Amino acid sequence: MSMHWDEAFPIIRLNGAGAKDFLQGQTTADLRKTVHGRLQQSCWLTATGRLRAVLELRLDDDGADVLVLAGDADAMAQGLDQVIFPADRVRMGERRLQRRIQALRPDSPAAWIDDESILPSEFAGSRRLLSTELEERRLRLGFPPGPAELTGNTNPFELGLAQCISLDKGCYLGQETMAKLAGRGGIKQQLRCWVSSNRLNSGDPLFDGETRAGVVTSILELESDSLVGLALIRRQYLTSGALNGPNGQMVTLERPELFQDPPSPD
């Protein structure tokens, strides 16, 4: 039986003719050719390129909906509100929750539907994932990042979100750092999924011999008594098939299914 992701996410509403241009300068995706009604994933960064939120944007004739897939929606709403000026021709609208569904295939598009809507025909016979199942899939996919990955110290390239980053659309919040990282290949660590039959905790260091190679971020205990999680692994150890925890625990590394490689330097 096929399964699908069905969850409600917070929406930040922006009203006004300037919503598209405003988001063009505040988020990482190039919206110049985005068709109204089509979902566009993007990121919201700090001025120094740290990831604050993963977004799904939908433009319309009256403004834009900003769905926060990962991150603090309240902090983002406050942050956007603080940088809106009269010349932007945009204003904050009402907040709401939006139901979002997506089949569990790497190339499957997402859809926004009403709370009481019948599932589209392509979901016939599909089962909604339970919360634990959904978390396991998130860890194996590497998307969306969770609170343990959104610490304020990571950038989108480290978390496999290169597809959300435009390097040629012009100036936006965090753009200078993204360009520098892409130009010199300066990604020091990358996200990896891991599995282990031994107990680990979030924040535990991972080692290659005596050398620190990474750190555990997310963790989930499965019914089989094994564990699956995410970790940030230093660049020089990305080809390692296994590392050890702080007490010698064996940890097997896997590339997350949806991880997108960071751009290579010219």
What are these regions (language model features)?
Residues 1-54:
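Acidic, proline/glycine-enriched N-terminal capping motif
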Residues 2-5, 10-13, 56-144:
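Acidic, low-complexity central loop/insert segments
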Residues 18-23, 73-77, 118-124, 200-204, ...:
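Short, conserved charged micro-motifs
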Residues 24-33, 78-86, 183, 208-211:
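Short, intrinsically disordered, mixed-charge
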Residues 36-39, 142, 147, 151, ...:
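Glycine-centered loop/turn motifs
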Residues 40-45, 103-106, 199-211:
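Short amphipathic alpha-helix segments
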Residues 50-51, 55, 137, 159-165, ...:
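Glycine-rich, small/acidic residue-mixed loop/short-helix segments
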Residues 116-192:
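Anionic-ligand-binding alpha/beta catalytic cores of soluble enzymes and soluble regulatory domains
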